[in-house]
Amino acid sequence: MTESSGGKRFGVIDDDRRRALSGLEFVQGLVDGTLPLNSMAETLGYDVVEVAKGHVVAAATPHAGHRNPAGTVHGGLAATLLDSAMGLAVQSMLDKGFAQTTLEFKISLLRPITPQTGLVKAEGKVISCGRRVGTAEGKLTDEDGRVLAHGTTTCLIYEH
């Protein structure tokens, strides 16, 4: 497990501890720092900043290290933020002993993102959550509320 200068921890959560938490408790732990974020969050510099049942927000500030060869921010940053926010929104609906994984997701990039864009937030909201499948939608916005990208996901729900 590693720790950032901001006090956030990164790593993998022990299976027994994870099974003992509801989905909402799990995501709340990511937000408040009592549970570690994944290593992708460390690599890309994003954080999970808000949670309510069926609703999650992840945020990042794009920087030069996120650029593609053309100079704009690589679409993978938007994809990762949306995948995280939407998937965790589904996770927040689950009972203890259950987890989810992304089966598929689709995003549409609407505006270029650059290092000058500033803070961006991906908001994921559950559309439907059944026993085996959950769906969610998401949007990525800048600080002025402009939609930079949007997407949908389908998640497989399984006993963990």
Summary of predicted features, one role per range:
Residues 1-160:
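Terminal targeting signals and extreme-terminal segments of soluble enzymes
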